[in-house]
Every structure is written in C-alpha cells, then in structure tokens.
Amino acid sequence: MEFLHESVALGVDLLILGLCAREYVHYKRTAKVLKAAPQYNIDGDLKSVVERQRDKKIPYAVIRGTVTPIGVPLRSSLVPSVSGVLQIVKLHEHRVTRGFAGFWTEQHKLLHESANEMPFELRNQSHGVEIVDALSAAVLDVDVVYDNYEPSNLSLFDHVFGFFSGVRQRGLQTTEEVLREGSFLTAIGELELDGDTLRMQPSNEGPLFLTTATKSTLIKRFEDAKTTTILKLVVCSTISAILVAFIAKKLYRKRKQEREEAKIRERLDTERRERRARSRPHTLSQDQLCVVCSTNPKEIILLPCGHVCLCEDCAQKISVTCPVCRGSIVSKAAAFIA
C-alpha cells in the first residue's frame, strides 16, 4: 500500500505506452506495405499481368477508377434523388450525463446502424475490377447525403428523472452515408483474377482501402501519424522512467532505513545480553541453564504447560511447541527464579 499511487500511475502509463507502441507498429507496417504496393492502370493489359502472378494474385496492389454498379444502383432511402452502390444509415442518441465530479458532459451513443451493399466495380472506360467486401475497408470514403437532428421534447417528469438518474436525452440524429455512383476512388488490396473477372478484396498483407486520396497522400497520412505516435512514445517513456526512478528511490530509502534500524536493534540486543551476562551469577547449576543453548539462565515460562526452560534469546526463536513436553505454546511470560 505504500507505493499504491505510484504503482497505479506507472501501470496506467505503461498501458498507454503499450497502446502507443501497438499503434506505431501498425502505422509503420501499413506505410511500408503501401510504399511497396505496385500501382496498375485498369486497362486491357491488367488481366495478363495478374494472370502471370503466382495463383493469379497480386498480394497488395493499387488501382484507381470510377465507381460503377453491377446492376441497378441503390437508391437512398432518405434522399431518393441520390443513387449509389453502398448505403449506411446510423441513428445516434445525443445525451448529457453527470460524471463523478458532478459535471454534466455531452455524449453520443450509436443506437442503430444498417448497411446495404450491392456488387460494384471500379471502371476505366470498358475495363473494370470488381470490389469485394467494401464494408470491411479500413478507410471507406463515403458522402453524407442526409443529416437530421431532432431535439427531444422532455416533460417535467423527464427532467426530474434525468436529474436523479444522471442521464438526460437531448435529441436523436439520423445520418445516411452513400458511396455515390460515379465517384473516383483509389482501391488498395489483393488483386485476383477469378476466371475472366478481376477482383479487389481484403488482403493478408495490409488493410483494404477505398478512398478518394491518392497513394502518396495515404502514405503521408500514415507517416504523419507515425511521427505523432513517436512523440507520444517519448512522452510516455519519460513519464515511466521518472515514475520508476521515484519508486526505486523510495525503495532504496526504505531498505536503507530498515538496515539502519536492524543495526540499531542488533546493537541494543548485544548491549542487553552483555548487561544480563554481567548481572547474572557466574556459577549456575545445570538445572538453572536454558535447555536449548545451555548458556543463559532460564528466564521464560511457557503457558499453558508451565515449563520454565528457555532463556529470553531462545524464547524469541521457539514459538510453536515446548522443547520439554512438546505441548503447544499459547503464551510466554517472564519467570523470576529465586
């Protein structure tokens, strides 16, 4: 308990340090695979390029093209004039909650999310690459086509109940995001030739990206994020080093104090034994000597057996059973032998 606050602070800092290190590794690896990923044009030569690869796959590649639905495009449920290939509708609750300190803070809570997706491809004139599992993309650039906030009409009872419960609803927000038909995107993932169809899908080499940014812009984003994470690592490492040094200093002082106290106790015990030796009679019979060390006189009575058989030094070391009768020792007391 002596180092509780320092230990908790160090544990939290190490946890944050671990999360930052994990982020750094992720950003570094993603930037590395992005730099190594080849970029191809969607044209008539792309199929032959993929076909020459092992298993007819390019593990991580970059393509750019126009979003084109395979079939009838989806219509926005909230804005019918908008069509696309992917639709995400979210319902958020806006509320204020009372924290431990008594302050009210605003929070957003996702109540419902639904997504619709249809087959689509990235095309360049008459050539295209089908996109598989677009919703799993690490970066998915979509357009917000609908955003509506409806404040709550709270009654007096709702206000009173919210005050005592610590949660008060402020309103509901509905948003709809659509990947529009005709959008120009950069897709990064595994490029595979399945029969006569080219497909872009999630890869084991790196995350799937469907973004309006270029490859170089994505790399710059991850490099900037990596630099920021390095600064976080430096700060967290410095704090950890300071906390470890502070705890080590306190431990050193504690151990030093304990050693000094032990030396004082040992010196006092030695002086006490010397005083006892000077004050006791020089000639003692065998019956008057401690049954353990046979040097000091009997000074302690063991209870409940009542045997007077130990000196004070040996009594400090024996606390379980009586050395004479092997009975359990409940307590000890000084014995005065005339």
From Swiss-Prot:
Enzyme class: transferase
GO molecular function, one term: ubiquitin-protein transferase activity
Transmembrane segments: 4-24, 228-248
Catalyzed reaction equations: S-ubiquitinyl-[E2 ubiquitin-conjugating enzyme]-L-cysteine + [acceptor protein]-L-lysine = [E2 ubiquitin-conjugating enzyme]-L-cysteine + N(6)-ubiquitinyl-[acceptor protein]-L-lysine
InterPro entries documented for this protein: MDM2_MDM4_MUL1, MUL1-like, Znf_RING, Znf_RING/FYVE/PHD
Coiled-coil stretches: none
GO CC annotation terms, alphabetical: mitochondrial outer membrane; peroxisome
Mitochondrial intermembrane-facing ranges: 25-227
Location of this chain's protein in the cell: Mitochondrion outer membrane
Membrane topology field: Multi-pass membrane protein
Pfam families referenced in this protein's UniProt entry, alphabetically: GIDE (PF12483), zf-C3HC4_3 (PF13920)
Knockout-associated phenotype: No gross morphological defects. Mitochondria are slightly elongated.
UniProt KW keywords: Isopeptide bond, Membrane, Metal-binding, Mitochondrion, Mitochondrion outer membrane, Transferase, Transmembrane, Transmembrane helix, Ubl conjugation, Ubl conjugation pathway, Zinc, Zinc-finger
Residues in the Cytoplasmic compartment per record: 1-3, 249-338
Enzyme Commission numbers on file: 2.3.2.27
PTM notes: Auto-ubiquitinated.
Zinc finger (RING-type): 290-326
A GO biological process held by the record: positive regulation of mitochondrial fission
Assembly and interaction partners: Interacts with Marf.
Record's function text: Exhibits weak E3 ubiquitin-protein ligase activity. E3 ubiquitin ligases accept ubiquitin from an E2 ubiquitin-conjugating enzyme in the form of a thioester and then directly transfer the ubiquitin to targeted substrates. Plays a role in the control of mitochondrial morphology by promoting mitochondrial fission. Negatively regulates the mitochondrial fusion protein marf by promoting its ubiquitination, acting in a pathway that is parallel to the park/pink1 regulatory pathway.
The name this protein goes by in its record: Mitochondrial E3 ubiquitin protein ligase 1
Organism of origin: Drosophila melanogaster
